[in-house]
C-alpha cells in the first residue's frame, strides 16, 4: 500500500497538514465547497505556469470570509518578488482578478532546496528536456539530496527513456525510504519532462527522518501562532449591552389585576 499511495495523503492528519485550509457549508453560488476547490486548482495552475523558473516547492492556500492568503515556498524568492516588488504586485493583481477577493501574498524562501523532493524532480526533468542522459541526471539528483542531509532518496523515471521505442520505468535508491512507516517524514515530488520523444515522468521520495511527538507538537504550535485569532465576543458567557458593558437584567413582572370580591348592589 505504501508503495502506491501518495505519501502526503497517506500521512494526512498524522504527520502532514492540508495545503488548503478553509471550510465551506454554503449553498450559495461562488461559495460552495466545489467552487473553492476549483478556484484552488486555478490558483495553483496559474502560479506554477507563471513561476516555472522560480523553483516553487509548494503553494499553501488559506481562506477567511473575504480574504485569501497564498503562501509561496520558493528557492528563488528574488524572481518571484522582482525588482522593487513589481513582480509580486503583478502576481497579486492577477490573483485578485482571478478570485475577485482580496489577496494576501506571502513569499517564503526554501532554506535547503537540494533536499526538497519537488525541486529535485523539477531539476531532473529540466536536465532530461536538455538531452542529458537519464541515469546521469538521476545520480546527480541522488548525490545532491544526500549532501543536503537526506537520510534516504528514491528517484523513479518513466517513459521512453533514451528514445527507446517501448516505454519503461527505472529507479535508483540510496539509504532508507520507509514508505509504510507513518511517523517517517517523507517528502514527495512529481514533475513531467517534455522531450522530443514524449513526456517522461519523474517521481522523487526524500526521507528526512522520523517525526517525534515533540516535533509534531512544535509544528502545530507554530501553525496556530501564525494564523490570525478569531473574534469571540461572548467567550466568557456574559450577556449585556456591548456599548456600556453593563449586565442586562430581566424586566420586572407586572402585577396581575385582582378581581373585585363583592358585587355592586
UniProtKB/Swiss-Prot annotation:
- Name the Gene3D superfamilies on file: 3.30.300.20, Ribosomal protein S3, C-terminal domain
Give the Low complexity compositional bias ranges: 250-265
Give the GO cellular component terms, alphabetically: cytosolic small ribosomal subunit
Query: Domain KH type-2, which positions?
Result: 43-111
- In the record, what terms sit under GO molecular function? mRNA binding; rRNA binding; structural constituent of ribosome
Give me the ranges of the annotated region Disordered.
217-265
Q: Domain of life here?
A: Bacteria
Q: Which GO terms describe its biological process?
A: translation
Instruction: Report keywords, A-Z.
Output: Ribonucleoprotein, Ribosomal protein, RNA-binding, rRNA-binding
Q: What Pfam families does the annotation carry?
A: KH_2, Ribosomal_S3_C
Q: Which PROSITE patterns match?
A: KH_TYPE_2, RIBOSOMAL_S3
Q: Where is the composition biased (Basic and acidic residues)?
A: 226-244
Output the HAMAP family linked to this UniProt entry: Ribosomal_uS3_B
Q: What does this protein do?
A: Binds the lower part of the 30S subunit head. Binds mRNA in the 70S ribosome, positioning it for translation.
Assembly and binders: Part of the 30S ribosomal subunit. Forms a tight complex with proteins S10 and S14.
Q: Which family is annotated?
A: Belongs to the universal ribosomal protein uS3 family.
Q: What is this protein called?
A: Small ribosomal subunit protein uS3
Amino acid at each position: 500500500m505504501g508503495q502506491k499511495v501518495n505519501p502526503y495523503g497517506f500521512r494526512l492528519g498524522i504527520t502532514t497538514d492540508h495545503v488548503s485550509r478553509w471550510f465551506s457549508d454554503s449553498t450559495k453560488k461562488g461559495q460552495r465547497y466545489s467552487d473553492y476547490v476549483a478556484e484552488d486548482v486555478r490558483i495553483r495552475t496559474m502560479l506554477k505556469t507563471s513561476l516555472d523558473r522560480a523553483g516553487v516547492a509548494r503553494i499553501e492556500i488559506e481562506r477567511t470570509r473575504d480574504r485569501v492568503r497564498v503562501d509561496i515556498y520558493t528557492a528563488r524568492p528574488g524572481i518571484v518578488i522582482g525588482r522593487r516588488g513589481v513582480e509580486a504586485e503583478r502576481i497579486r493583481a492577477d490573483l485578485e482578478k482571478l478570485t475577485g477577493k482580496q489577496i494576501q501574498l506571502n513569499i517564503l524562501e526554501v532554506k535547503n532546496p537540494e533536499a526538497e523532493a519537488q525541486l529535485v524532480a523539477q531539476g531532473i526533468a529540466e536536465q532530461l528536456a536538455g538531452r542529458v542522459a537519464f541515469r546521469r541526471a538521476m545520480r546527480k539528483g541522488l548525490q545532491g539530496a544526500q549532501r543536503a542531509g537526506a537520510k534516504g532518496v528514491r528517484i523513479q523515471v518513466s517513459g521512453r527513456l533514451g528514445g527507446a521505442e517501448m516505454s519503461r520505468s527505472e529507479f535508483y535508491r540510496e539509504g532508507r525510504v520507509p514508505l509504510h512507516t507513518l511517523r517517517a517524514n517523507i517528502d514527495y515530488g512529481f514533475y513531467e519532462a517534455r522531450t522530443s520523444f514524449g513526456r517522461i515522468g519523474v517521481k522523487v521520495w526524500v526521507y528526512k527522518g522520523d517525526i517525534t511527538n515533540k516535533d509534531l507538537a512544535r509544528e502545530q504550535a507554530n501553525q496556530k501562532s501564525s494564523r490570525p485569532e478569531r473574534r469571540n465576543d461572548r467567550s466568557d458567557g456574559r450577556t449585556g449591552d456591548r456599548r456600556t458593558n453593563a449586565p442586562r437584567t430581566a424586566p420586572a413582572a407586572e402585577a396581575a389585576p385582582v378581581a373585585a370580591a363583592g358585587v355592586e348592589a
